[in-house]
């Protein structure tokens, strides 16, 4: 009997010039022998927002429930979504010191997307020898460069 749920491997990355500053995000999605590359940008953002956005946008591409392995070089993203988020939800999106969670809007949207899939989060060393991470980094840099070019045109 064939398994109904597809397996997808996703590599994500974010890039930012300045923090905050122009930024980009990128993701490589792999399903069977097919690779899909996506990227985007924001004119004023942070590296952490771009890391979360990369994972969020990659998951939004999926049309049906999947078994997903997400590879990220961001400890912030990996720890945030696997460890910290449970307390944030319990504390109404506040940290233990009662300060609001940064990027709560993105965390909430990402958490909602997670409920549609079975997900394993894996951390990889950035700028190393992992070809998927290298591809995601190039896409994020491409997104960041787009933001920089737009800002140059605006003067």
Curated annotation (Swiss-Prot):
<protein>
    <recommendedName>
        <fullName>Ribonuclease H</fullName>
        <ecNumber>3.1.26.4</ecNumber>
    </recommendedName>
</protein>
<feature type="binding site">
    <location>
        <position position="137"/>
    </location>
    <ligand>
        <name>Mg(2+) 2</name>
    </ligand>
</feature>
<dbReference type="GO" id="GO:0043137">
    <property type="term" value="P:DNA replication, removal of RNA primer"/>
</dbReference>
<feature type="binding site">
    <location>
        <position position="13"/>
    </location>
    <ligand>
        <name>Mg(2+) 1</name>
    </ligand>
</feature>
<feature type="binding site">
    <location>
        <position position="51"/>
    </location>
    <ligand>
        <name>Mg(2+) 1</name>
    </ligand>
</feature>
<keyword id="KW-0255">Endonuclease</keyword>
<dbReference type="GO" id="GO:0003676">
    <property type="term" value="F:nucleic acid binding"/>
</dbReference>
<dbReference type="InterPro" id="IPR050092">
    <property type="entry name" value="RNase_H"/>
</dbReference>
<keyword id="KW-0460">Magnesium</keyword>
<comment type="similarity">
    <text>Belongs to the RNase H family.</text>
</comment>
<feature type="binding site">
    <location>
        <position position="73"/>
    </location>
    <ligand>
        <name>Mg(2+) 1</name>
    </ligand>
</feature>
<dbReference type="InterPro" id="IPR022892">
    <property type="entry name" value="RNaseHI"/>
</dbReference>
<comment type="function">
    <text>Endonuclease that specifically degrades the RNA of RNA-DNA hybrids.</text>
</comment>
<dbReference type="InterPro" id="IPR036397">
    <property type="entry name" value="RNaseH_sf"/>
</dbReference>
<dbReference type="Pfam" id="PF00075">
    <property type="entry name" value="RNase_H"/>
</dbReference>
<keyword id="KW-0378">Hydrolase</keyword>
<comment type="subunit">
    <text>Monomer.</text>
</comment>
<dbReference type="InterPro" id="IPR012337">
    <property type="entry name" value="RNaseH-like_sf"/>
</dbReference>
<dbReference type="GO" id="GO:0000287">
    <property type="term" value="F:magnesium ion binding"/>
</dbReference>
<dbReference type="InterPro" id="IPR002156">
    <property type="entry name" value="RNaseH_domain"/>
</dbReference>
<feature type="domain" description="RNase H type-1">
    <location>
        <begin position="4"/>
        <end position="145"/>
    </location>
</feature>
<keyword id="KW-0540">Nuclease</keyword>
<dbReference type="GO" id="GO:0005737">
    <property type="term" value="C:cytoplasm"/>
</dbReference>
<keyword id="KW-0479">Metal-binding</keyword>
<feature type="binding site">
    <location>
        <position position="13"/>
    </location>
    <ligand>
        <name>Mg(2+) 2</name>
    </ligand>
</feature>
<dbReference type="GO" id="GO:0004523">
    <property type="term" value="F:RNA-DNA hybrid ribonuclease activity"/>
</dbReference>
<keyword id="KW-0963">Cytoplasm</keyword>
